[in-house]
Amino acid sequence: MCGIIGFTGRLEAQKILTEGLAALEYRGYDSAGIAYFKDTGKISIRKTVGKVKDLLAICDDENNSTCGIGHTRWATHGGVTNANAHPHKVGNVALIHNGIIENYHEIVNKYDLADSLISETDTEVAAALINKLYDGDPKATIKKAVAELQGSFAFCIMFKDQPGKIFAVRNVSSMVATYCDDGAFIASDLTAFIKYSKRYFILPEYTIMTMTADGIEMEDLEGKKVEPDYLEVNWDVTAAQKDGYPHFMIKEIHEQPTAITRTITPRIKDSLPCFEDDNIPDSFFEDISDITVVACGTAMYAGMVGKALLKNKFGIPVSVEIASEFRYEQPVLTDRSMVIFVSQSGETIDTLEALRLANKYTKKTLSIVNVKGSTIARESNYVLYTHAGPEIAVASTKAYTVQVASFYLIGCKLGLVSGRMTKEEAKTFIENLQEVPNLIESVITQAPEIEQLTKRMTNATNAFYIGRGLDYALSMEGALKLKEISYIHAEAYAAGELKHGTIALISEGVPVIAVATQSHVYSKVISNIREVKARGAYVILLSKDKDITDKSICDVHISLPQAPDEFAIFESVIICQLIAYYTSTGKGLNPDQPRNLAKSVTVE
C-alpha cells in the first residue's frame, strides 16, 4: 500500500528520499512527504496532497541534510488532505507508517491523546503515543508503544534529540533494509534503493532497528541482538525504469516472453518438470487428495486457470479461494491437502494470514511469489520464485503469465507423479510450454491493430468478456484489466450462463470480448456469440481461426497463432492486456497508476 523510505549516511537525503518515493509511487499516490534533520537539530517536514512531483515543488533546493524519512500515501484512515499526509510530527517524534492500527480509538482514550491530534489518521495516534511514552530512550519507548498496538504496522521513526538516527519496527507490513558505502537505507520495497545496493535484508517482525551513518543495529523485544540475513537480487535499476516505453505497463507486456523463460527454464530438465533447484522433492507431489488455491485479484485469476487445467487435464479436485474469505472461515483441509498461495509481492496481507491458517492443518503448502525472501515465501513449506523481475505498473501483466506458467509446471509434475500422464505426454506438454514465449512474441506484433480497434471501446460504459473452460478463466483476468485501468465496468461470464440473467444487460453497441480457443466447446461459444450479436452487441472475437467465413457473428476478429488448446490462453491474455492498455491511454488515463488502487495490498 503506502511507500516508505528512510536514509541516513553520507549523501544528500532529500534527493534519495524523493527519488525513492518516485520509485515507490505505484504503492500509493494520494499524497507524499518527507521529514529530515536540519543543522539546528530540529526536524523539518515537507508534505502535500498529490504525487511526488508535487512534493518536489515545495522542497528546499538548498537542503543538505543527510538523514530523513519519506512516505507516499494510499489513504486508508482519513481523507486525502495535507493534515492526513505523512510524515506526522507530534512533540519530539516524527513518524511514517504503512499498515492499519486497529485499536487507535482505545489508545486515544487510554492515554488522553485527543488534544495532541490534528489529523484523522491512525498513524498520528501512534506518533502521539510514542511521544507520550518517550523518556529519552528510543528503543525502550518503541517497545512500550508496540506492546499497545493492535493491527499491522511498519514504522520509521525519528526523535528530535537523536539527530542522524532512524528507528524502525514492523509487524506484518514488510520493510527491507541495507547498509552500504553510502549509508543505511530502509524502504517498503527494494526498488527505492536498488540504485545504491542490490543487497538487502528483510527486517524481522518485532525487531527494533537503529540506523546511523556508521551502520545498522537490530535487537528483538527482549534486547537480544539480531543479525541481518542479506539477500541479493539479479536485476538492477534499469529493470525498474521505463527504458523508452511510454508506460511501465506496456513495457511489462513486452517483457513477458523473457519473464516466462526465466520462470520455466530452470525447472525443466530433459524436457520434464524438475523442482530440484527449488529443493522440492517429488514426494511433496505424492498422495495429494485435493488442492486449494488461495490468492487475491489477478493472482486469484491465475489460480482459476490453474484450477481449470489441473481439474480437467489431470483429474485433480481443485478449489480456488479468495484469501480475505478463506482466512476467516473454517478450512476443510487434511494432511493430504495441498494449498497453493499466489502473490506477486509475497506480502499480500490476506494471503499471508490465510497461509498461517493453512499451516495449522497441512504440511503441503506451496507459494508462487516473485520477491525473494518475502514473508509468504519464508512461511510456506516450499516456494516457487517466478523470477519475473520488478513489476511496477499497478495492473499486473507479466506476474500473471508467470504464475500461470508455474501452474502448468506444477500440473505436469502432478500428472507424472500420479501416473495420470506418461513421460512422453509430459515431454510434449513441456515442449509446448517452452514455445509459449514465441507465441507471445508473435501476438505482441498485433499491437497496432489492437490500438485501432479500442477506439470504439473508449466511449463504452460497460463491457463483457465471455468464454468456456480455460477461456472463461482467462476472461476473468481480461475483465479485471479493463475495469481497473480504463474505469469501464467490465465483467466476465461463462458463455453458457448468458441466458441465465446476464443477457438482459446486452444492448446496442455494448462491447463483448468473446474468447473461443477451446476446440471441444468452440461451436457452443459461437452459438452464444450469436445470441449477444442478435441483441446488438459489438463483438470482438479471439480465436485460432485464420479467417471467419460467417462475418455476421462478430464485428472484429483477432486471429491467434495456432497452438494446442491449453496454451492458447497465453495468447488470448496478451490481447486482453493490450485492449485494456490502449483503451486506457485512448481515454487519456495513466494505466500505471489507476485511481484508488495500489500495487501491494498489505492492509486488510
Predicted segments with their positions:
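Conserved short alpha-helical segments that host acidic/polar catalytic motifs at enzyme active sites
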Residues: 1-242, 246-247, 258-289, 301, ...
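Glycine-rich oxoanion-binding loops at beta->alpha junctions
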Residues: 50, 66-83, 269-282, 306-342, ...
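Active-site phosphate/pyrophosphate-binding segments
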Residues: 256-260, 264-292, 382-511, 584-604
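Generic C-terminus detector
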Residues: 538, 553, 563-604
